């Protein structure tokens, strides 16, 4: 009988979490949802020097923002030490591990000799018990490490969902340290015990873990566990072709939120960063889960494309509810010195979002492009001299007068503008540009009738009158 699907995301809370990291949560999450399985969150926090609570918070916050909900966890490895020690004791009883007294200095010297001889540096099994072998005397005062008794013959073979069949000879693998002298277990051992205890059926992770896989499989088999399906994801590259990392300028997951990206856009983009469904570029979370499979995971490194993300974000911004955008934009307005009271006194923010969103790649950009609605106009002197000429002043005055009595609709404003243009034999830019400058302080706005409608009759008429006085 096939086991119910159980996947996991197992990050180390040692700082920065970027798109390349969180992709290793997205794909197992999607696979678990697709297969009606269970998605487990496990925090691998055994690196006490580098693990921080702030990093855990960043992981949880990033997952929550993208909607990557987990069914179990978060489990913390540091809270499972008793379980690891229990399994270590069982392995000692079964002669699956053995104490090794080789010092770090001795191991370094051994590796140097091996390199000099053109051999692969590895532990040579000095302390591995074998029938008829006489072991050295344990040195006084030295606490040993525990090494796993790796098989000496045969191969580790698995059918990777991304890489295909992978075969590693056991002769290539030395006896791995699975417990340090102080008794704390090492990474590869903890991972195996966790995957076994948590019933993980599919391990979907970055291909930087490929070298760990044969070692983990051997430990898992020694413990009587069933080997999961492995899918090792190729690296995510930055735009310069380097591995994505903080050192190479990668943005944190929450940095995208703080830059004005929508989570649905980032999730859509991230989904395509190593997986495809035909030519589909834009799809909902629900479609992604419905379509996701391991067969269409990419086999080559995926390269981050910021322009592509901006294009996707613009699409989702245009589709987004204007009231939602208004709430998201408020912090960006605040950062620009436009507080809630100023917004409340100005044009309807929801309406501003509806008008301004089509041209923006981010919510931050919408706010930046919309400051004209909440600040007094301060047009450039050169632009004023160019557009507000003596020749156009009579038309401006007539337009202002018409707006005093016109019905305040987009259609009525457009009709008044058209009538003045006809009466003065002007082309649209000759009147629209000075009106934009005097009312909004800039010539760069959407359709003039839509902009004036949002400003409101009183503001428009008073600003035109003040400029013409």
Curated annotation (Swiss-Prot):
Belongs to the class-I aminoacyl-tRNA synthetase family. Glutamate--tRNA ligase type 1 subfamily. GO terms for molecular function: ATP binding; glutamate-tRNA ligase activity; tRNA binding; zinc ion binding. Disulfide bonds: none annotated. Monomer. Pfam families: Anticodon_2 (PF19269), tRNA-synt_1c (PF00749). This is Glutamate--tRNA ligase. Residues 118-131 have a biased composition (Basic and acidic residues). Gene3D superfamilies: 1.10.10.350, Glutamate-tRNA synthetase, class I, anticodon-binding domain 1, HUPs. One of its GO terms (biological process) is glutamyl-tRNA aminoacylation. It catalyses: tRNA(Glu) + L-glutamate + ATP = L-glutamyl-tRNA(Glu) + AMP + diphosphate. SUPFAM superfamilies: An anticodon-binding domain of class I aminoacyl-tRNA synthetases (SSF48163), Nucleotidylyl transferase (SSF52374). HAMAP family: Glu_tRNA_synth_type1. It comes from Burkholderia pseudomallei (strain K96243).
């Amino acid at each position: 009988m096939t086991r119910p699907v159980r996947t996991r995301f197992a990050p180390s809370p040692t700082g920065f979490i970027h798109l390349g990291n969180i992709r290793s949560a997205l794909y197992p999450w999607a696979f678990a949802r697709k297969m009606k399985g269970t998605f487990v969150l496990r925090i691998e926090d055994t690196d006490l020097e580098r693990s921080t609570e702030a990093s855990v918070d960043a992981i949880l916050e990033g997952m929550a923002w993208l909607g990557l909900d987990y069914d179990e966890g978060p489990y913390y490895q540091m809270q499972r030490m008793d379980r690891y020690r229990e399994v270590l004791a069982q392995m000692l009883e079964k002669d699956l591990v053995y104490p090794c007294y080789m010092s770090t200095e001795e191991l370094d010297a051994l590796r140097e000799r091996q390199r000099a001889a053109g051999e692969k540096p590895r532990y040579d099994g000095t302390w591995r018990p074998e029938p008829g072998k006489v072991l050295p005397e344990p040195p006084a005062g030295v606490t040993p490490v525990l090494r796993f008794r790796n098989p000496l013959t045969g191969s580790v073979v698995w059918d990777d969902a991304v890489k295909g069949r992978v075969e590693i000879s056991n002769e290539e693998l030395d006896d791995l340290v699975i417990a340090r002298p102080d008794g704390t277990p090492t990474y590869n051992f903890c991972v195996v015990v966790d995957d076994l205890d948590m019933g993980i059926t599919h391990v979907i992770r970055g291909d930087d873990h490929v070298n760990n896989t044969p070692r983990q499989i051997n430990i898992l088999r020694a413990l009587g566990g069933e080997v999961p399906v492995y899918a090792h994801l190729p690296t995510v590259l930055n735009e310069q072709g380097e591995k994505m990392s903080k050192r190479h300028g990668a943005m944190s997951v929450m940095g995208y939120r703080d830059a004005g990206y929508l989570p649905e856009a980032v999730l859509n983009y991230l989904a395509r960063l190593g997986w495809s469904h035909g030519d589909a570029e834009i799809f909902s979370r629900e479609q992604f889960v419905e379509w996701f499979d391991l067969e269409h995971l990419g086999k080559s490194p995926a390269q981050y494309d910021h322009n592509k993300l901006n294009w996707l974000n613009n699409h989702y911004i245009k589709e987004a509810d204007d009231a939602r955008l208004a709430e998201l934009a408020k912090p960006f307005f605040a950062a620009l010195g436009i507080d809630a009271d100023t917004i409340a006194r100005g044009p309807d923010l929801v309406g501003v979002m509806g008008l301004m969103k089509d041209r923006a790649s981010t919510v931050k950009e919408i706010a930046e492009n919309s400051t004209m609605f909440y600040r007094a106009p301060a047009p450039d002197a050169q632009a004023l001299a160019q557009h507000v000429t003596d020749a156009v002043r009579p038309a401006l005055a007539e337009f202002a007068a018409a707006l005093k009595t016109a019905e305040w609709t987009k259609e009525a404003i457009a009709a008044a503008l058209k009538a003045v243009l006809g009466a003065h034999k002007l082309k649209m830019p000759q009147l629209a540009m000075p009106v934009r400058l005097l009312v909004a302080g800039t010539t760069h706005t959407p359709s003039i009738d839509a902009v004036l409608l949002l400003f409101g009759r009183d503001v428009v008429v008073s600003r035109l009158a003040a400029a013409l006085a």
